[in-house]
Amino acid sequence: MTSSTGTGGTGSAVGTGSTNTTVGTGTRGAGGGFHLPAGSAAAGPYALDIDPRRAGWGYSSLRVVELEPGGTHEFATGESEWIVLPLSGGCTVEAEDRTFPLRGRPSVFEGVSDFAYVPRDADVRITSSGGGRFALTGARCTRRLPARYGPASGVPVELRGRGNCSRQVNNFGAAGVFEADQLIAVEVLTPGGNWSSYPPHKHDEDRPGVESELEEIYYFEIAPHLPADGDGGAVPGLGYQRVSPSGPGSATDVLAEVRDGDAVLIPDGWHGPSIAAPGHDMYYLNVMAGPGLERAWLICDHPEHAWIRGSWEEQPVDPRLPLYHAPTVEGEGE
């Protein structure tokens, strides 16, 4: 078995201006805080390796594996269900005597990807003839569902918010869209200069029909600036992520400069905004899971900021969106 890893993301360096403010005694990740700069949570074959043990919580996991052309990665799913999602490149996923060729995509900024779901208590093999970077989104679970393929054409692409709060959400693993036991996973794309995850919201209490209790991971990729004349090469981008305590017992307090390949752990608290710097589109992959009997994404807006939703009624969606559409059934595999 061969497996190749790098420092995470698309290779952009994490600058020295990265800011991470944490207070209290809340959950800590592999890097000692809630903000994990690219490479700080690498382990073994993974450029990023977040599991319940490392995060100090109960359910959510995220791994990123980078394969050279012809590379292979094998893993056991253990107590978790997983979705294998190409971030760049394509691959073949083998599990449960099933084989799922994934077309993938050139990058997260260039298309919706197909994906493969693999159940708990299974052995999985990922092979990539052309090489690429692949996210493994996971959640501890009880039910054992069948391995299956998720077509890109079946991914609902949602335009959320208005004005400079416009963003695109690829709901590939959302509750009510794709069946899983506990895992919820979506992609969010924010045009440069816009805010997303806004208004700030939380999902850290189990209130049936009102709010879900969900741990969450944000994994970021930031589009570089490409000078028109090619002079000097690509300029790395950045963004910002805010998380604030939501009440007694919530100690998650983060103001982080996030760059390509960074991750932020959110065990609790108000999270948002996620801010994309002008000229640099922002991508983040959200992975969520929790103890609730109902697999649902129910959120509570911050009361001081919830009014912003009413202001969107008179504003258009950012004309830069969508950055792309899901392919038609006929277009897949072309």
Predicted regions: what they are:
Residues S3-R28, P227-G233:
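Intrinsically disordered, low-complexity terminal tails and inter-domain linkers enriched
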Residues F109-S129, A139, E257-P278:
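Conserved metal-binding segment of the jelly-roll/cupin
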Residues G132-F172, P278, L285-E334:
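Double-stranded beta-helix
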Residues T2-S3, G24-E74, E81-G90, P316-P319, ...:
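Hydrophobic, proline/glycine-rich low-complexity stretches
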Residues R54, S61-T127:
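Extended, compositionally biased flexible segments
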